[in-house]
Curated annotation (Swiss-Prot):
<dbReference type="GO" id="GO:0009349">
    <property type="term" value="C:riboflavin synthase complex"/>
</dbReference>
<dbReference type="InterPro" id="IPR036467">
    <property type="entry name" value="LS/RS_sf"/>
</dbReference>
<feature type="binding site">
    <location>
        <position position="120"/>
    </location>
    <ligand>
        <name>5-amino-6-(D-ribitylamino)uracil</name>
    </ligand>
</feature>
<comment type="function">
    <text>Catalyzes the formation of 6,7-dimethyl-8-ribityllumazine by condensation of 5-amino-6-(D-ribitylamino)uracil with 3,4-dihydroxy-2-butanone 4-phosphate. This is the penultimate step in the biosynthesis of riboflavin.</text>
</comment>
<dbReference type="InterPro" id="IPR002180">
    <property type="entry name" value="LS/RS"/>
</dbReference>
<dbReference type="GO" id="GO:0009231">
    <property type="term" value="P:riboflavin biosynthetic process"/>
</dbReference>
<keyword id="KW-0686">Riboflavin biosynthesis</keyword>
<feature type="binding site">
    <location>
        <position position="27"/>
    </location>
    <ligand>
        <name>5-amino-6-(D-ribitylamino)uracil</name>
    </ligand>
</feature>
<protein>
    <recommendedName>
        <fullName>6,7-dimethyl-8-ribityllumazine synthase</fullName>
        <ecNumber>2.5.1.78</ecNumber>
    </recommendedName>
</protein>
<feature type="binding site">
    <location>
        <begin position="58"/>
        <end position="60"/>
    </location>
    <ligand>
        <name>5-amino-6-(D-ribitylamino)uracil</name>
    </ligand>
</feature>
<feature type="binding site">
    <location>
        <begin position="87"/>
        <end position="89"/>
    </location>
    <ligand>
        <name>5-amino-6-(D-ribitylamino)uracil</name>
    </ligand>
</feature>
<dbReference type="Pfam" id="PF00885">
    <property type="entry name" value="DMRL_synthase"/>
</dbReference>
<feature type="binding site">
    <location>
        <position position="134"/>
    </location>
    <ligand>
        <name>(2S)-2-hydroxy-3-oxobutyl phosphate</name>
    </ligand>
</feature>
<feature type="active site" description="Proton donor">
    <location>
        <position position="95"/>
    </location>
</feature>
<dbReference type="GO" id="GO:0005829">
    <property type="term" value="C:cytosol"/>
</dbReference>
<keyword id="KW-0808">Transferase</keyword>
<comment type="pathway">
    <text>Cofactor biosynthesis; riboflavin biosynthesis; riboflavin from 2-hydroxy-3-oxobutyl phosphate and 5-amino-6-(D-ribitylamino)uracil: step 1/2.</text>
</comment>
Length: 163
């Protein structure tokens, strides 16, 4: 079976020195530690600096991103890319569907309206075992995957801006 992870692109000259924002939901600390490690490794390898903001849950991620983008712009230090990290585990109520769908929709709305490269690393799973398989950098590395997606979109944005 093919490796499901996005490949790391090696030519990072056009994005080196860019600034990224990671917003993580700390609902499951151990899982978030693993996802954050994967995302940070990808950003560092690509030559980006980054800030991390922590929020209580996945639904708070889009609002925190919007607030941070506005503040960074106001201070003359805009972010070039954003990575959202979180974990939503299915329970016995429809809360899972609401959190999963609304956080994803809000992130897509932000990416499109703000024209910001955004990697969605909010994993949605049925079990803790599935969460761990997706969080660990040695397995599916969804934190790293979200960072690679944001980096790929940043490359596209910069190439198209050049004309």
């Amino acid at each position: 079976m093919a490796d499901p992870r996005r490949a790391r692109l090696t030519d990072d000259t056009e994005i080196a020195g860019a600034r990224a924002l990671i917003v993580e939901a700390r609902f499951y600390d151990d899982i978030q530690d693993a996802m954050l490690e994967g995302a940070r490794a990808e950003l560092t390898a690509a030559g980006l600096t980054h800030d991390v903001i922590t929020v209580p849950g996945a639904l708070e991620i889009p609002a925190a991103i919007a607030i941070a983008l506005d503040a960074a712009e106001a201070h003359g230090k805009p972010y070039d890319a954003v990575i959202a990290l979180g974990c939503v585990v299915r329970g016995d109520t429809i809360h899972f569907e609401i959190v999963s769908m609304e956080s994803s929709r809000a992130l897509m709305d932000l990416a499109v309206s703000r024209k910001i490269p955004l990697g969605n690393g909010i994993i949605t799973v049925n079990t803790d075992e599935q969460a761990w398989a997706r969080a660990k950098a040695t397995e599916l590395d969804k934190g790293g995957d979200a960072a690679r997606a944001a980096l790929a979109m940043l490359r596209i944005k910069r190439r198209l801006a050049k004309g």
